[in-house]
Design a protein with these regions (language model features):
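N-terminal Sec-pathway targeting helices
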Residues: 1-15
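Aromatic-lined substrate-binding rim segments of carbohydrate-active enzymes
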Residues: 25-28, 52-118, 166-193, 207, ...
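Hydrophobic faces of well-ordered beta-strands that scaffold small-molecule active sites
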Residues: 33-39, 67-69, 102-106, 152-156, ...
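Short, acidic/polar
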Residues: 45-61, 133-144, 196-205, 286-296
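Conserved, mostly hydrophobic/aromatic
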Residues: 67, 95, 141, 154, ...
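Active-site groove signature of glycoside hydrolases
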Residues: 73, 109-114, 134-169, 306
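Substrate-binding cleft of secreted/luminal carbohydrate-active enzymes
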Residues: 107, 152, 257-334
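Glycoside hydrolase catalytic-domain groove-lining segments
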Residues: 180-181, 185-273, 323-329
Length: 334
């Protein structure tokens, strides 16, 4: 009991220190920041949008120059052994035309609900067979795009150590290492491994990464508690960065690049966004919260930040007569 008491006191002291430290931290200058977005074709379709129209608007109206694209397994291999890269080709080719830089994510666990994305034809396969098919899809994807100079990073899986979120099998660390090794064997560009910013410890993901990506969320909805705002100052991320370096051997060596792979810039409610009223959407992400999160990320000290929710901003502008998010991003961020 005494040890637990000492541990609690230590946590409270650190927490108090982080808030004091936070008062002395300035936002990184805008000209030092590199901003990007994540684009998800299935999410754009779910919102009732023409996915090509919004994608081109991201590139031409927002003028985004850094974009994370996703090679969803069910989309690129809809039938076993039959690959269809046409939609992903379109996304990559249009980005290349505009001199945008790309992160290309591959794997089973990728952005957007249900987090793990598998083709329907794998439903009755055992895990061993399924994993072999997964490696085949990853290899096909990397080989197809390895000559694209605009791709600056590969991302292997998305938050693979966040095992209690999403409809996913438990992460097999040995198999994850196999995926990473496969990508390294096919191309020399850095591999991103990402982890949750608030509740994960980063060490397992960071030690496997060439570039480490953290998520950054401020307001979430969690059953049975409802809406919850993380009571964390931006210095929490600076502290976590420092501590994780100790355990990965980076403190006195060459530190790895750390980026914010997902900065919350859309709602997180009890249901998918399309089922929420506009009023309910704004509970977890209103315009002031949107701007506040961008400032929060700049104070956290990471110079490369990918905003999460560009499809929603466009939906607000086109379907809900609420253009402020899109216009702010256009004039102040990109």
């Amino acid at each position: 009991f005494q040890i637990l008491l000492y541990l609690l006191v230590l946590i409270l002291v650190i927490y108090f220190f982080l808030w004091i430290w936070n008062f002395f931290i300035d936002e990184l200058p805008q000209d030092q920041m590199v901003y990007g977005v994540t684009f998800s074709k299935p999410y754009a379709v779910e919102l009732g949008l023409d996915w090509k129209e919004i994608y081109l608007a991201i590139l031409d109206d927002l003028k985004v120059k850094n974009i994370r694209l996703i090679a969803y397994w069910p989309e690129v291999e809809p039938k076993e052994g039959k690959f269809d890269f046409r939609d992903l080709d379109f996304q990559i080719n249009e980005a290349v035309k505009r001199n945008a830089k790309i992160i290309l994510a591959v794997g089973r666990r990728l952005p957007r609900w249900p987090e793990c994305h598998e083709p329907s034809w794998t439903l009755n396969q055992n895990l061993e067979v399924k994993n072999e098919k997964l490696l085949e899809y990853i290899e096909k994807t990397i080989l197809r795009y390895k000559e694209v100079e605009a791709i600056k990073y590969w991302q292997v899986e998305n938050e693979p150590f966040l095992m209690r979120f999403g409809i996913c099998p438990k992460t097999n660390i040995e198999f994850l290492d196999k995926e990473i090794a496969l990508v390294h064997s096919l191309d020399s560009r850095p591999v991103i491994i990402s982890d949750n910013g608030e509740v994960s410890i980063w060490i397992n993901a960071r030690k496997r990464a060439d570039v480490f990506g953290t998520t950054m969320y401020r307001v979430i909805w969690k059953k049975p508690f409802g809406y919850f705002r993380y009571p964390l100052p931006s210095t929490f991320f600076r502290f976590k960065d420092f501590v994780s370096k100790i355990f990965t051997g980076e403190l006195f060596g060459q530190p790895k690049k750390v980026i914010v792979i997902e900065l919350q810039a859309e709602p997180w409610g009890p249901e998918v966004t399309t089922r929420l009223t506009l009023e309910e959407q704004f509970v977890s992400m209103d315009f002031e919260g949107f701007k506040g999160n961008i400032g929060y990320a700049r104070r956290a000290g990471f110079k490369e930040v990918y905003l999460w929710g560009v499809e929603w901003w466009y939906w607000l502008k086109e379907k809900a007569n609420e253009p402020r998010f899109w216009e702010f991003a256009k004039s102040k961020i990109f």
